[in-house]
């Protein structure tokens, strides 16, 4: 009898699991449920679609229900939400969001790839029509349309993480004046403070107003705009606020099914990506992972690890015995004409974990050219390297520069 596998959620982890499983098992019945309209898209490209760097949304769509069906014989059901898991009878309850019709589907193996959602804090005025978040293709469409219809000339970004920084650049590209508000004393938390100063300098040189160490206490709507009230008493007025303060795992389905979760709501999995129920796997932003450096538990919502997890889960469903080694957290972001990349742990994390500089680790910060200085076009880059005092282990690295950042961070990441 052929195995029946149900996958809940598409995009990175779910779609990868489905495609890889089909390559390993030609006979399995594979059903993928996705509550949205799109099952596989480049979510990292959404800010660049808003900024018209990627003008066509079709370029963001990696797979469609039709392509997955024709190429991999996968039964894709979009706009259908799995609302309940009956672990005892190995069934899921499904609601068709277009027709409100409800149904029940059985499974042999279940994969949860429910992803994450933007954090919406409980701040007065947060539900304003002027406040947007960017996480899906529909979000990008909505923001693009709003900017054009309302001839937006200024905006406020709340949060200086990857999405906040990329949206800042892309709104400036559209000629929009941007203020960036960050509760911490720096943007880009994966970078240490001294390295983040180079990012601050780049942002300010490109006309971005920074409000660092400043939280938002409330939002107040006026007749034609919204006031962003900051913790230091300042008020900033605008007609467009982009909220990008982080994400939370979509683990409500797992919680209602009684699966083990961590304190942040992440699904607990073993090295084979099985949950506390051996017939249920989980991958992507929704799971707790092992930090590759510290070996502690953490949450790292990145597309690259989600894809790797999808491949490993598919292999194990097909009878292999692969293990996920943990997430290193390598990432890179473009900030106007500069690239900033990191891999492994930063110094803040080492100190938090009890390591002592000079005893447990050393750091090296150097400035070097992107290529030989005698050849025209070389540009400077800053490199911070964290390593054990005996020189046998690299803990992490951060690099900021205009050229050659990617290949250097790749090399260090591989060495780690």
Predicted regions and their residues:
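Glycine-rich dinucleotide-binding loop and its adjacent helix/turn
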Residues: 112-174, 209-210, 263, 269-271
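FAD-site-proximal beta/loop scaffold in flavoenzymes
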Residues: 127-151, 223, 227-229, 234-316
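Mid-to-C-terminal Rossmann-like scaffold of FAD/NAD(P)H-dependent oxidoreductases
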Residues: 2-4, 286-404
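Beta1-alpha1 glycine-rich phosphate/pyrophosphate-binding loop at the start
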Residues: 2-75, 79, 119, 168-191, ...
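Short hydrophobic core segments
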Residues: 105-115, 158, 236-246, 310, ...
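Beta1/beta-strand and adjacent pyrophosphate-binding region of the FAD-binding site
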Residues: 1-11, 152-161
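A Rossmann-like FAD-binding core segment of flavoenzymes
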Residues: 27-29, 71, 77-98, 105, ...
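Rossmann-like dinucleotide-binding cores of NAD(P)H-dependent redox enzymes
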Residues: 61, 154-155, 162-219, 300-306, ...
């Amino acid at each position: 009898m052929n195995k029946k596998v149900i996958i809940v959620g598409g995009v990175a982890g779910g779609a990868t699991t489905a495609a890889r499983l089909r390559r390993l098992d030609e006979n399995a019945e594979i059903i993928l449920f996705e509550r949205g309209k799109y099952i596989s898209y480049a979510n990292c490209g959404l800010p660049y679609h808003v900024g018209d760097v990627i003008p066509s949304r079709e370029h963001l769509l990696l797979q469609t229900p039709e392509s997955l069906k024709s190429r991999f014989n996968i039964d894709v059901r979009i706009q259908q939400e799995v609302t309940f898991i009956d672990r005892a009878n190995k069934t899921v309850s499904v609601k068709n969001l277009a027709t409100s019709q409800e149904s029940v589907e059985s499974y042999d193996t279940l994969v949860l790839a429910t992803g994450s959602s933007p954090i919406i804090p409980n701040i007065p005025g947060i539900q304003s029509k002027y406040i947007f978040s960017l996480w899906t293709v529909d979000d990008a469409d909505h923001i693009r349309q709003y900017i054009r219809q309302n001839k937006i000339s200024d905006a406020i970004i709340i949060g200086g993480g990857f999405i906040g920084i990329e949206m800042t650049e892309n709104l400036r590209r559209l000629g929009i004046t941007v203020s960036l508000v960050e509760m911490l004393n720096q943007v880009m938390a994966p970078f240490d403070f001294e390295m983040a100063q180079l990012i601050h300098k780049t942002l300010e040189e490109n006309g971005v107003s920074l409000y660092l160490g400043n939280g938002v206490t409330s939002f107040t709507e006026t007749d034609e705009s919204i006031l962003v009230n900051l913790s230091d008493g300042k008020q900033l007025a605008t007609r467009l606020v982009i909220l990008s303060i982080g994400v939370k795992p979509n683990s409500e389905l797992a919680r209602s099914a009684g699966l083990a979760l961590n304190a942040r709501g992440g699904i607990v999995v073993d090295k084979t990506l099985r949950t506390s129920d051996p017939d249920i796997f989980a991958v992507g932003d929704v799971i707790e992972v092992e930090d590759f450096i510290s070996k502690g538990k953490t949450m790292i919502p990145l597309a690259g690890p989600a894809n790797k997890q999808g491949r490993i889960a598919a292999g194990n469903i097909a009878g292999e015995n692969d293990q996920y080694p943990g997430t290193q957290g390598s990432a890179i972001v473009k900030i106007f004409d500069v690239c900033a990349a990191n891999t492994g742990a930063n110094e803040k994390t080492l100190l938090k974990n009890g390591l002592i500089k000079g005893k447990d680790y050393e750091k090296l910060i150097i400035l070097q050219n992107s290529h030989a200085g005698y050849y025209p076009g070389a540009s400077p880059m800053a490199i911070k390297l964290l390593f054990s005092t005996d020189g046998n282990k690299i803990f992490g690295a951060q690099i900021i520069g205009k050229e050659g950042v990617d290949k250097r961070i790749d090399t260090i990441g591989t060495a780690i």
